[in-house]
Regions:
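Double-stranded beta-helix
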Residues: 204-262
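Short, conserved beta-strand element in jelly-roll/cupin
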Residues: 192-204
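Fe(II)/2-oxoglutarate
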Residues: 1-98
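Catalytic core of Fe(II)/2-oxoglutarate
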Residues: 242-322
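Extended, Lys/Arg-enriched charged tracts that mediate electrostatic binding to polyanionic substrates
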Residues: 137-186
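Short linear interaction motifs
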Residues: 170-191, 236-249
């Protein structure tokens, strides 16, 4: 199924959403003008929309067609660095060429028609060395109080996927919430480590996300008296299913991530996935978790200190920990 048709929303056509997770940055205004953002028509069961893709029975995906957001929707989605709230901000940043070029072998391998060369590359010493050097770079993007980097790796995905995360290969999971720190209660997810994902490939890739954090979704479910299991082993599945089954008109945001760009996002605190629709080569990305800070060159030391106090959870910031 193609996703090339995009409509433009008028103010009166906009779907009700909430002011939750926002795209922030010094240059966030560019997202208004370069067609980097689209909104879905809602959320749909994957099997009803993509019969030719191997989605598992309980998967959900953004509902087609995509459309350009109206100006009031962009006002809700975009903000300056100073507007960032804990666990409710996403930033698209440019990665230095010298960092991206560490993975030149992966880009070359991504041009092949099969994944054989990519498997060789990602399991080899060249890739491991590039990961170690990149960990040092992304470590400098964290808060000084929480400098550690965890779960650094390089992944590759097939081109042309509406969503990219597997469940039990070859099944696709669909829109989901990450569970690396699954023992952290929902109400504490605003302070877990965020994820950085660098586009190392040759084509644009996309971040898909619901612009409501887990605590906001919880309140939406409570308001409608919708119940879900809080058992830790199934909580995020039950939680996201309860939301997506009952709020099927809620739009999913699609953000373009160009080669050499990265997103920083609270993937433990939002329903999301990636997409490789439109790619002609394998998708390659570096991914790692850490307590990343918003990247900004326009605020002074006092403003930076205020932002740190607002976004960091004092001395109780969630430490990096192994999944149990």
């Amino acid at each position: 199924m193609q996703e090339t048709n995009v409509v433009v929303a008028k103010e009166s056509d906009t779907v009700t959403s909430i002011s939750g997770i926002r795209l922030i940055g010094d240059d966030v205004g560019r997202l208004r003008s370069d067609n980097a953002i689209e909104l879905s028509s809602g959320i749909a069961p994957a099997k009803s929309q993509y019969s030719s893709f191997p989605y598992w029975t309980g998967a959900f995906v953004p509902k087609l067609p995509w459309r350009r957001p109206a100006s009031d929707e962009l006002d809700s989605l975009l903000g300056s660095v100073e507007t960032a709230q804990p666990g409710r901000w996403i930033q698209v940043i440019r990665i230095p060429k010298e960092v991206v070029d560490l993975f030149a072998g992966g880009r070359i391998a991504s041009k092949n028609s099969t994944d054989h060369k990519l498997r060789e590359y990602t399991s080899g010493s060249e890739c491991r060395e590039a990961i170690l050097k990149t960990v040092k770079y992304v470590g400098a993007l964290t808060w000084p109080e929480q400098p550690n980097i965890d779960r650094a790796s390089v992944f590759f995905k097939d081109p042309g996927l509406p969503t990219t995360t597997p469940r039990n290969y070859p099944e696709l999971l669909g829109l989901h919430i990450d569970s690396a720190y699954h023992n952290v209660p929902f109400e504490e997810r605003n302070h877990v480590p965020m994820r950085i994902s660098i586009n190392l490939g040759l084509n644009d890739r996309f971040l898909l996300f619901v612009s409501a954090s887990m605590d906001q979704i919880h309140h939406m479910l409570v308001d409608r008296k919708i119940q879900y299991s809080m058992q830790s082993s199934v909580a995020t599945h039950e939680f996201r299913t309860a939301f997506m089954s009952n709020f099927h008109d809620f739009p999913v945001v699609k953000v373009r991530i160009r080669p050499g760009e990265a997103y920083v996002a609270p993937t433990e605190n939002m329903i999301h996935d990636g997409s490789t629709v439109g790619q002609t080569h394998f998708d390659v990305q570096f991914s790692a978790c850490g307590h990343f800070r918003p990247q900004c060159s326009s605020i002074d030391a006092a403003a930076a200190a205020f932002l740190s106090a607002k976004l960091l959870k004092d001395q109780r910031a969630v430490p990096l920990q192994a999944k149990k």
